[in-house]
Amino acid sequence: MLRKRLYLVFALFMAGLMLFTACTPKTGGNAPVKITIFVGFGAGSDPDSMAALNTIAEEYNASHKDIQIEFMFSTWEEHTSKFSTLLAGDLAPDLAFPIGIQGIAEFYDEWIDVSPYVKRDTYDTSDFYGPSLQLLNFNDKTIGLPLGVYPSVTFFNEDLFDAANVPYPPKQYGDTTWTLEKMIETAKLMTLDGNGNNAASPNFDPTKITQWGWGGWCGPFRTVPGKFGGNPLGMSDDFKTANMNTDGYLEGMQFLYDSIYTSHVRPSSVDEGSTFTGMDFTFESGKVAMFECFSWSSYAFPNFTTAGNWNVAAVPAGPHGDVVSPVNADTFAIPSHSKHPDQAWEVATWLMQPEMQSRLCGIFGCIPSRKSLASGWVDSMSAEYPNGDFQVFIDSINYMDASPNNESWVPNYSKVWDTTENAMSRILSGESSDVQQVMNDLQTEVQGYLDEYWAANP
């Protein structure tokens, strides 16, 4: 009898165990793959953007069973150290998104070539702007697909033009009269001293300027040489010889110096610090008639509007006929240390769908890289800022510095970048009036960094 009771208890236990096992969710091979998306190489880390991206993740995860996504956020200031730490700890994310050309350059060897995926899937790229595709085609690989671009345009204050009775700059590209020389002539008429004399007047006092005709270029110095027919990278094609004290680099820096200290149309960095405190752009003051900047300045458009009626025009041609609209861009990159590159590509192409691309550019502030989305973007921006001609931004895409781009990789990237910016700072601050010497110093220092790199990477 005891043996029978024990058998019955054992049978009931086994039946319960089998029932429990059958009802327990399965793990292991059937678990969804989690794709981690690193956000920090550009836009996307402010509270509103993070909330919007997390909503997108929830939507994706609700509609996909085999793959789940999660955004990992970092501030811009910490993105380099945080990403490096993840790589060192074998915790590489599966996507970096959004990421620009500078972010790609910072970790260039880490990103995989996506062209095999494009070929395998016969991915249709015909809707993307040609220059936006060219921007991502590097010598040895293609990194990402175009999400959005930030072309440069000439911003101008209509009220200051009207007060000076000066015609507005042209909005259409192809006007051969719109040159940097013409821009300086125009800027002189709206550069005023305390007595109301403009910079074209013999009575003008450059020590008492109250209004400037031009605010300069808002980007790094590498956006400048291309306007003067030079290579924005300032070195030979094999990256072994610096070319920074001649041609486009020298001409561009001389132009900056002359705009401040000869024609007096641009404020120096000292003026900017004393007159335009608390502003990201001098144009926000209502005391600057024109400046050139990327479309990512859209976050400041409300301040532009407060300063007066503003509009946009084409970028002027340089002295050798070069019309260059410097551009920044957003894309994605798949790390070579990702454990799930195939699934990362699948997620990336989902993010690149037209509807999602439009939505993401609304979050990040970019212009969608798909031609089919242009009219929608123009209509949306025009509704918010009816005085602006936003078609000019779209037209500028055809003139962007796609290859090489002003943020493209060079050896010892950060050292070369910082040294170049320091050279420009010496001119903008008035620390040096000898442009040739500044560029000779830059040439020597950069050549040293190139030699250092190639000695370590023969």
Q: Would you name each region that the model predicts?
A:
Residues S115-F128, K171-D175, N203-T207, W212, ...:
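Short, solvent-exposed loop/beta-turn-alpha elements that line the ligand-binding surface or hinge
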Residues Q68, D140, T262-H264, N303-S369, ...:
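Extracytoplasmic/periplasmic substrate-recognition and gating elements
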Residues T186-A187, D237-G273, V315:
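Glycine-centered hinge/linker elements that transmit conformational signals in sensory
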Residues L2-R3, Y7-A11, A15, F20-Y108, ...:
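Conserved N-terminal structural module of periplasmic/extracytoplasmic solute-binding proteins
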Residues F73-K82, G174-K182, S268-E284:
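Short helix-initiation/N-cap motifs at beta->coil->alpha
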Residues T75, I99-V153, E181, A200-T207, ...:
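Hinge/lid segment of periplasmic solute-binding proteins
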Residues N139-L147, S152, T179-A242, V288:
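Extracytoplasmic/periplasmic solute-binding protein
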Residues N387-E445:
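C-terminal capping/gating helix-and-loop segments adjacent to ligand/active sites or protein-protein/ligand interfaces
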